[in-house]
């Protein structure tokens, strides 16, 4: 029987590490222990720095353009999406298809950026993230805000509210709920009223956005780009970023440990610090990364029937470094739980993995309770965490989909690769394994306690 290439690589890599250590003479046992300690420290360093590096890779790819478009814009300029995410969307994993995004990567090192939030009668908020993927603020009230590096000293115009961010790199994500393609003109009208400019330009009375730059080498998928880095490239990048995006004060203990690997602001990484077989250990660590993240992040998951979701401290991670990396890898830019929760399932009611080879019914007994302007949706993703290509370009069902309801008000959604006779309540999936996200925006407390979550049953 021929062994699959992926399994062969896993076994071969592991075997090589075992042989390399067991062949050492007895008198070098202490050195072997040091090697194991170096491996553990390497993992710790990677888990600590990954969110910062993936954030920068996302910034690099998203700003790699001379002029603003619907999916890229130079630094300090809006990326106004003109349509919902689809199967071609690769900028972030698990994109939502409920809202139109307006994003911007900001550099607030020289001066604050003025951000104008317009008046609207629908769900609209602006998530402000620092370079470490923490949510510094959520802007919902109409008005003018100055997004400012925390150590900036200066005067702001009257009526402008200061928003402090501890890092120079900032990512803003505005989400505007959409009721369907026919609602796009209304959403674009809201986008047109949004404002973004440097403080000096605001004080001068206007601003002509400068041209950006384009480099073909920066046309990459951020997650793939970061996971393909070797140790030196990864930690060189992290060290450089920490110069202008300083670690939190609470990170001091871990940084003292990582100094042994020359990881930290002002450090110059030397892969010789990893000892013998450093390249092999790096590859082995990456192979085991997903399993380790899933295992160590279980303490932060919350159960909701057959669904699980990431609870606090999501969005404000503190020293939960492994959890922070897990979220950055699987759902970069996730909201805090007061804004939204994202229950996920990849199994049916019997615990069997969901696959496009079967047909399922998702039964929603009652809509999840939400606060004013809240809403819900169910979205299907493939094994790669991207939306699944399908013949009708439908990637989710939601409370705005015009779904057929049963006499008791419940909803039955068909999950399948092949279309049913009536496609009104059909959510297409691909041939392979898939998983579902149930997004609940502005959840009421009852959604987490008294509400009966949906059930996925195999037909």
Protein language model features and the residues they cover:
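Signal peptide processing junction and immediate N-terminal pro/mature segment
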Residues: 24-32
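Acidic/proline-rich low-complexity IDRs
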Residues: 22-23, 40
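A compositional/structural signature for long, glycine/proline-rich flexible linkers
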Residues: 32-459
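N-terminal secretory signal peptides and thylakoid transit peptides that target proteins
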Residues: 1-15
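Bacterial N-terminal signal peptides
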Residues: 15-21
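Generic low-complexity, intrinsically disordered sequence content enriched
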Residues: 13, 27-28, 45
């Amino acid at each position: 029987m021929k062994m699959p290439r992926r399994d062969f690589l896993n076994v071969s890599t592991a075997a090589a590490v075992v042989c390399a250590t067991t062949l050492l003479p007895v008198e070098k046992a202490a050195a072997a222990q040091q090697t194991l300690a170096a491996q553990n420290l390497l993992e710790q360093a990677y888990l600590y720095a990954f969110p910062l590096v993936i954030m920068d890779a996302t910034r690099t790819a998203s700003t790699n353009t001379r002029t603003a478009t619907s999916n890229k814009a130079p630094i300090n300029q809006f990326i106004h999406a003109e349509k919902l995410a689809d199967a071609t969307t690769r900028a972030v994993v698990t994109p939502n298809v409920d809202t139109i995004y307006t994003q911007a990567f900001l550099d607030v090192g020289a001066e604050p950026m003025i951000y104008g939030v317009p008046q609207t009668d629908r769900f609209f908020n602006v998530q402000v993230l620092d370079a470490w993927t923490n949510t510094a603020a959520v802007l919902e009230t109409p008005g003018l805000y100055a997004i400012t590096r925390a150590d900036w000293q200066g005067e702001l115009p009257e009526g402008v509210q200061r928003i402090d961010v501890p890092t120079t790199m900032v990512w803003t994500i505005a989400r505007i709920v959409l009721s369907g393609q026919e609602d796009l003109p209304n959403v674009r009208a809201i986008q047109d009223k949004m404002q973004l400019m440097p403080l000096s330009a605001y004080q001068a009375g206007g601003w002509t956005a400068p041209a950006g730059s384009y480099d073909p080498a920066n046309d990459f998928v951020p997650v793939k780009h970061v996971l393909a880095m070797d140790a030196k490239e990864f930690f060189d990048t992290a060290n450089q970023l920490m110069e202008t995006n300083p670690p939190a004060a609470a990170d001091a203990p871990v940084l003292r440990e990582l100094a042994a690997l020359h990881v930290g602001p002002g450090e110059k990484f030397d892969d010789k610090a990893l000892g013998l077989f450093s390249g092999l250990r790096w590859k082995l660590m990456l192979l085991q990364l997903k399993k380790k993240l899933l295992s160590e992040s279980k303490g932060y998951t919350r159960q909701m029937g057959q669904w699980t979701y990431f609870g606090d401290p999501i969005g404000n991670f503190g020293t939960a470094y492994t959890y922070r990396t897990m979220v950055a890898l699987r759902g970069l830019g996730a909201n805090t739980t007061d804004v939204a929760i994202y229950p996920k399932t990849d199994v049916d009611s019997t615990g069997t993995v969901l696959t496009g080879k079967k047909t399922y019914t998702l039964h929603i007994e009652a809509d999840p309770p939400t606060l004013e302007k809240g809403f819900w949706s169910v979205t299907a993703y493939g094994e790669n965490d991207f939306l699944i290509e399908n013949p009708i370009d439908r990637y989710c069902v939601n409370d705005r989909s015009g779904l057929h309801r049963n006499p008791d008000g419940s909803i039955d959604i068909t999950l399948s690769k092949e279309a049913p006779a009536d496609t009104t309540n059909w959510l297409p999936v691909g041939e392979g394994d898939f998983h579902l996200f149930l997004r609940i925006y502005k959840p009421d407390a009852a959604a987490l306690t008294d509400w009966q979550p949906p059930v996925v049953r195999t037909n």
